[in-house]
Design a protein with these regions (language model features):
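Fold-independent oxyanion-binding glycine-rich loops
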Residues: 12, 40-41, 50, 69-70, ...
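Phosphate/Mg2+-binding loops and adjacent switch elements
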Residues: 99-166
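Phosphate-binding P-loop
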Residues: 1-4
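N-terminal phosphate/diphosphate-binding loop that engages ATP/GTP or pyrophosphate donors
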Residues: 23-88
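A generic local secondary-structure boundary/capping motif
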Residues: 25, 91, 122-125
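Phosphate-binding/switch loop-helix module in NTP-utilizing enzymes
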Residues: 78-105
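Glycine-rich phosphate-binding P-loop
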Residues: 7-29
């Protein structure tokens, strides 16, 4: 795996992971740091639309379909009978950037911040996981690691950038 700075955002469902990643991308790119994201999906997903040419290519058996336009390109790789690739296998497919924010991949070994909302009714992951370096919560918590207000995007960005060496 090439040298890439990676930082994760993990937490139980409905604890604000995606919203935090979204705000962090805006905040960090606004500071001149290039960012890509990697999102783990626990379910089948499809970026394509039935009936479109690219969908027809995939349904006909194409292993990969590369869709390009003047605005963006997207590569769809069909796993078929292959096992799900790990995080490191996917990271090498990204173009070089300063930082990759990863949403999900709780059990991977990279450093992470956990999102926590009291209303979600779930316990914290952090106490049993040393890779979780901080928690972003909507309620005050007493922990053995930094705790941020979930809405303190600037403070969380400062922490992450410091953690990865910026």
């Amino acid at each position: 795996v090439r040298d890439v700075r990676v930082y994760g955002v993990v937490g139980w469902k409905n604890t604000g992971k995606t919203g935090l990643v979204e705000r962090l991308v805006t905040e960090i790119t606004g500071r001149g740091v290039s960012v890509s994201t990697l999102k783990h999906a626990h379910h089948a997903f499809d970026l394509d639309q039935p009936g479109r040419d690219s969908h027809r290519h995939r349904m006909a058996g194409a292993r990969e379909v590369l869709l390009g336009s003047g605005k963006r390109w997207a590569l769809m790789h069909e796993l078929r009978e292959e096992p799900e690739p790990g995080m490191d296998e996917l990271l090498v497919r990204l173009a070089p950037v300063d930082l990759v924010l990863v949403e999900g991949y709780k059990s991977a070994g990279h450093a992470k911040i956990e999102t926590h909302r009291a209303a979600a009714g779930q316990g914290l992951i952090a106490p049993g996981d040393a890779t979780i370096r901080a928690v972003a919560s909507d309620v005050p918590l007493e922990l053995d690691r930094p705790v941020f207000n979930l809405d303190d995007t600037g403070g969380i960005a400062n922490f992450i950038l410091s953690e990865v060496g910026f």
